[in-house]
Every structure is written in structure tokens, then in C-alpha cells.
């Protein structure tokens, strides 16, 4: 039978999106405020099933395009292995592999990739670029990090907390370090959504953007921003930190290391937390700067569970957004 195309036909507006349906992006924690707990529970359930030998191939025939403007260990490996376990395929694209790195517009890149892949994962230099790609892509866009937020990491951390604590609501999370980075911002929103109280402990010049503080407070949780490290971990159920020098801040490394002196998570701070408190770090860790190795590899640390859960949490995200 001959196939006849009419003038009204379009080819692959977005191969993962049926015509008439709204696509869904994960750019901010606020994008999952209605179903965050459901996604976390899905990740825990899929992890359990996979480890018991059950198939989790829920995305057969699906392709994830991964754009990396920043280097990565965990983000790349976790997304690639996740797609393999789901029965799909992941395509790695560094900025040097595609024309985006040579001046092609984000708009054209988004429109073209939307014709080839079912979802785009973007690890971006800027939140502005992330928003622009999502604006023009006709398939879902999942953030692998930008300069303002890191939603996949905080979904991972909340999954890890639930595995170890059994709940979120009413717990106290203390984040020590760079309060103005993407992890801190996403913690504020994520804790708000699940009902955890949060204390950000950071030098004043590195406090979070007021937008994220105000959004977190709208959820009715206790939000404290302080530069006082003494007693900072009192009543903490979770203690978290991150590198003092994020990618893109290398030119400011010397000044940052001076500014953050005294904010190292050490045994004393962990002993001042609750006896069953856990320690989180998204890695890579720089020992004796943001955390001592004794803490990072100590009995309260769950950082390697956390690292593994990047894969399971992202599996849950992709099943939610791509299936």
C-alpha cells in the first residue's frame, strides 16, 4: 500500500511525546513537587526488584541523548547504566562532539535532537541555557546539573535518606559549606517538598539565593541560614556537604579555601548530631577540606549508598518521564 503524506503531516515533533500531550521536564525540584515521594518510592521498589533478579526493562526501544558541557563520573555512568538496565540506549554527546560547541544555537540543537531521541539529559554550564534547551526541545529534558540546581542529586539523596530513616517528614537536615551552590538550592526545595527542616551553615558571602529560601519556607518547614559553625549539627538527622570549589569556580579556589576554613565536617560535628545521624556527600570529595576522610568513610557515612542510588533514582525519574 502506498503511503501518502498530506501537507498537514509532521515528522517526529518529538518522538517521545504523542501529539496533543504536554511534555514534562525536570529542571528544578519544583517540577516534581506533586509526585516526589512517588518517584522516590518507585526508585526504592525498582532497586529491590532488580536486586532480586527481576527484569526492569521498562524503556525498551527508547533513547536518551546526553549533552555534557561539564565533565562527570557519576552522572554519565549512572545514566548510561540506568538506560541499559531499562532496555534502552544512552548516547553520550560532549560539547566537542556536537555543533553546540562550535556555535550552533541551543534552539536548533534542541529541535534537531528532539527528532532523534526520546529524552535529553543536559549537564549545563548555566541555568539559563538549561531553560532555553527545555523551551525548544519537544521531548522531555532532564537536568544533569547546572549552576543553580541539581535535582537528580537531591532526589537521590532523599531516596537514600528514606532508605536509612524510613521517612522524611520532621527530620532535620544540616548542610555545611557553599550555601550558594546548586546542591544547597535543590536541598532547600527538596526538603520543603518532603517536609524536612533544613539548616544551611555557610559563610555569609556564600548564602543561598533568596528565591530558594523563600520557596522553601512556603512549604511550612523550618529554614535556618547561619554562618555559625559552633553547635551547627545539634539535633541533625542528616549532615551533608559538598565541594567548596565547584566546576567553573577554579579561578577562585585560593580565596574560597580561605573563606571556608573552619567549615570542615569532622568527627566533632558528627558527634554533636543525633547518634543515628547519617552523612551525605554527592562526591567527589576533597578530604580535609569540606570533610575529613574519617567521616566520609566512617560508620555514619552512607555516601557510597548515595552514589549507587544516583542510578536507581534516575531510573525512577526516567520511567516517570519517558514511559
Regions found by a protein language model. Name each.
Residues 217-293:
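Rossmann-like adenosine-cofactor binding region
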Residues 69-82, 165-241:
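Glycine-rich phosphate/diphosphate-binding loop of Rossmann-like nucleotide-binding domains
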Amino acid at each position: 500500500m502506498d503511503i501518502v503524506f498530506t501537507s498537514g503531516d509532521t515528522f517526529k515533533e518529538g518522538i517521545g511525546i504523542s501529539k496533543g500531550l504536554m511534555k514534562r521536564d525536570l529542571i528544578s525540584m519544583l517540577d516534581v513537587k506533586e509526585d516526589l515521594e512517588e518517584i522516590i518510592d518507585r526508585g526504592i521498589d525498582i532497586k529491590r526488584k532488580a536486586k532480586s533478579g527481576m527484569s526492569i526493562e521498562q524503556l525498551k526501544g527508547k533513547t536518551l541523548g546526553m549533552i555534557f558541557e561539564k565533565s562527570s563520573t557519576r552522572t554519565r555512568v549512572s545514566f548510561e547504566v540506568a538506560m541499559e538496565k531499562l532496555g534502552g540506549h544512552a548516547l553520550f554527546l560532549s560539547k566537542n562532539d556536537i555543533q553546540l560547541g562550535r556555535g550552533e544555537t541551543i534552539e536548533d540543537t534542541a529541535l534537531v535532537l528532539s527528532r532523534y531521541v526520546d529524552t535529553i539529559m543536559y549537564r549545563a554550564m548555566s541555568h539559563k541555557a538549561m531553560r532555553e534547551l527545555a523551551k525548544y526541545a519537544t521531548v522531555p529534558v532532564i537536568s544533569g546539573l547546572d549552576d543553580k540546581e541539581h535535582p537528580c542529586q537531591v532526589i537521590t539523596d532523599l531516596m537514600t535518606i528514606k532508605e536509612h530513616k524510613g521517612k522524611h517528614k520532621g527530620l532535620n537536615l544540616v548542610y555545611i559549606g557553599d550555601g550558594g551552590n546548586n546542591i544547597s538550592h535543590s536541598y532547600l526545595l527538596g526538603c520543603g517538598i518532603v517536609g524536612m527542616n533544613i539548616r544551611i551553615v555557610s559563610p555569609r558571602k556564600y548564602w543561598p539565593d533568596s528565591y530558594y529560601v523563600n520557596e522553601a519556607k512556603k512549604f511550612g518547614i523550618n529554614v535556618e541560614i547561619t554562618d555559625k559553625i559552633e553547635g551547627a549539627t545539634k539535633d541533625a538527622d542528616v549532615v551533608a556537604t559538598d565541594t567548596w570549589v565547584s566546576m567553573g569556580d577554579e579561578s577562585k579556589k585560593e580565596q574560597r579555601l580561605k573563606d571556608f576554613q573552619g567549615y570542615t565536617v569532622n568527627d566533632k560535628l558528627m558527634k554533636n548530631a543525633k547518634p543515628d545521624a547519617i552523612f551525605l556527600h554527592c562526591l567527589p570529595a576533597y578530604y580535609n577540606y569540606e570533610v575529613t576522610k574519617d567521616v566520609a568513610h566512617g560508620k555514619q557515612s552512607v555516601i557510597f549508598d548515595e552514589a549507587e542510588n544516583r542510578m536507581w533514582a534516575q531510573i525512577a525519574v526516567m520511567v516517570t518521564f519517558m514511559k
